[in-house]
């Protein structure tokens, strides 16, 4: 089932320097909660400055949903320490609140008034809040409080030059973009390995079902927790953060222009379903527009091609201008075993897997095959640890045992690891391979199995509160390592100044401005 990567691996072993200079970045979301696990109703902590313009700490959907962002970094340990500093400073500046350590929220009732993230009075800030109003009215606020980790990854120019010859200008844009689309297609085909190893949401609180019927064969504990005994990541299931109305958009990942055309079409295509919500009610705007996507960011995807946008530029226009610059991996649950929601083992694994995805042959993928890849993902998400589980290739009928496919993949990853270790020194990447490959013969080692044992003992709420309390105490005590207190104070002041400047510069009324942007 795994493509034959032997020639590409042999090429890599002859060109190890092609991997020198991998760049990455992390984003981590987490809900602010009270000591009893309920959602914090306070505003964004003052010490964290403006959520609209702060470089490192912002908010996602809700005012209580923090998002930490590291700068681009070539050093894994430095990046993780930077992320830890962001958590340390925040833990010291959020009063008695703490950070929820799980992807799935618990103590939130459907219909509870979850305050949308607030970004001030500038047109840009009001637009961001209106987008969230649209998300709430389309999908419900509860789904939007699910948290995850995003891992951003780019290969060095040396890799593309070694692989594609001496490239520059428009030629480089085309070839590098084609290379990243290969990564994306392989990710759709084999990325289920991420929830298998690192999925950490095998259970949900009963409030999450919102009284809706479900066809999933949930088991229920006395405290009202619903779980699937072999599930890995209910966050990635249809119960979690997905968008069924997008499944027939036909967006594919074979070509830059085709992809962008599909995305631009989706933001122009009217939706009957969303038209029923209305645009405005009693003088209050309910969504930006009633199209399938209000804006491009609404496209749900487990992986995204990205380029840093310029002021006023849409994500797709940035891609058209310069091609794909990096990949955003979006399938990581919060790691409940780490105070910062992600750890070095995961980052090193993702490095290995992304390199493998760039090397492995990846035939073009139709929208129907893309839909077929969802079958493997769903199996792993809902019953990934089930003995005897098999996976298929695309829409073909042949089936392969998951443990065998996993071990075959890791045979290749071990060779990538040897190459990365040869240029970085040490054996850190090989060690990660040795640790993780054991999960295929022993699924009890996976994150989902480990966290489910705790959840069955103490419930999701009990587990979440215990980790949150422990991490709060730990992070508050640890000294900062990279950033200093004065760096945070300076960024707070600078972010507030940037927001004020944006607000002062706006001359158009929001309604007029919105007509141009909706």
Swiss-Prot record:
GO CC annotations on file = cytosol
Give, as in the UniProt entry, the pathway in which the protein acts.
Sulfur metabolism; glutathione biosynthesis; glutathione from L-cysteine and L-glutamate: step 1/2
Annotated GO molecular function terms are: ATP binding; glutamate-cysteine ligase activity; metal ion binding
Report the family membership: Belongs to the glutamate--cysteine ligase type 1 family. Type 1 subfamily.
HAMAP family from the xrefs?
Glu_cys_ligase
Q: Which Gene3D superfamilies does this chain map to?
A: 3.30.590.20
- Organism encoding this protein: Escherichia coli (strain SMS-3-5 / SECEC)
Task: List the protein's name.
Answer: Glutamate--cysteine ligase
């Amino acid at each position: 089932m795994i493509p034959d990567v032997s020639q590409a691996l042999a090429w890599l072993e002859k060109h190890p320097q092609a991997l020198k200079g991998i760049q990455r970045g992390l984003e981590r979301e987490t809900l602010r909660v009270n000591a009893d696990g309920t959602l914090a109703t306070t505003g964004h902590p003052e010490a964290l400055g403006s959520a609209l313009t702060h470089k490192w700490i912002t908010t996602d959907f809700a005012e209580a949903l923090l998002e930490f962002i590291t700068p681009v970094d070539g050093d894994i340990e430095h990046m993780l320490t930077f992320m830890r500093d962001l958590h340390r400073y925040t833990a010291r500046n959020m009063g008695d609140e703490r950070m929820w350590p799980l992807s799935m929220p618990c103590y939130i009732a459907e219909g509870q008034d979850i305050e949308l993230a607030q970004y001030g009075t500038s047109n840009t800030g009001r637009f961001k809040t209106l987008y969230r109003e649209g998300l709430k009215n389309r999908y419900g606020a509860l789904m939007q409080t699910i948290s995850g980790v995003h891992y951003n990854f780019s290969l060095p120019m040396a890799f593309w030059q070694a692989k594609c010859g001496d490239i520059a200008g428009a030629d480089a844009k085309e070839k590098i973009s084609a290379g990243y689309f290969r990564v994306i297609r392989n990710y759709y085909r084999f990325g289920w390995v991420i929830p298998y190893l690192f999925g950490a949401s095998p259970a949900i609180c009963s409030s999450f079902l919102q009284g809706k019927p479900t066809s999933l064969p949930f088991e229920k504990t006395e405290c009202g927790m619903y779980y699937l005994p072999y599930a890995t990541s209910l966050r990635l299931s249809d119960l979690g953060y997905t968008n069924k109305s997008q499944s027939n958009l036909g967006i594919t990942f074979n070509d830059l222009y085709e992809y962008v055309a599909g995305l631009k079409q989706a933001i122009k295509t009217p939706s009957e379903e969303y038209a029923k919500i209305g645009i405005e009610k009693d003088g209050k705007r309910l969504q930006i527009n009633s199209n399938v996507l209000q804006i491009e960011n609404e496209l749900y995807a487990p992986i995204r091609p990205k380029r840093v946008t310029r002021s006023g530029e849409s994500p797709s226009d940035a891609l058209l201008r310069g091609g794909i610059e990096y990949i955003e991996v979006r399938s990581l649950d919060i790691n409940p075993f780490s105070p910062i929601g992600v750890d070095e083992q995961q980052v090193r694994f993702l490095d290995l897997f992304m390199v493998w995805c760039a090397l492995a042959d990846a035939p073009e993928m139709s929208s129907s095959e893309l839909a077929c890849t969802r079958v493997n993902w769903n199996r792993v998400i809902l019953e990934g640890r089930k003995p005897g589980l098999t996976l298929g290739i695309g829409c073909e009928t042949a089936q392969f045992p998951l443990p065998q496919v996993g071990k075959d993949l890791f045979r290749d990853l071990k060779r990538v690891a040897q190459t990365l270790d040869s240029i970085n020194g040490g054996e850190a990447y090989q060690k990660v391979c040795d640790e993780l490959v054991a999960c295929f013969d022993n699924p009890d080692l996976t994150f989902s199995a480990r966290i489910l044992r705790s959840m069955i003992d103490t419930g999701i709420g009990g587990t979440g509160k215990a980790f949150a309390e422990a991490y709060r105490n730990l992070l508050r005590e640890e000294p900062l390592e990279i950033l200093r207190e004065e760096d945070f104070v300076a960024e707070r002041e600078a972010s507030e100044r940037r927001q004020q400047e944006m607000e002062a510069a706006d001359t158009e009324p929001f309604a007029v401005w919105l007509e141009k942007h909706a």
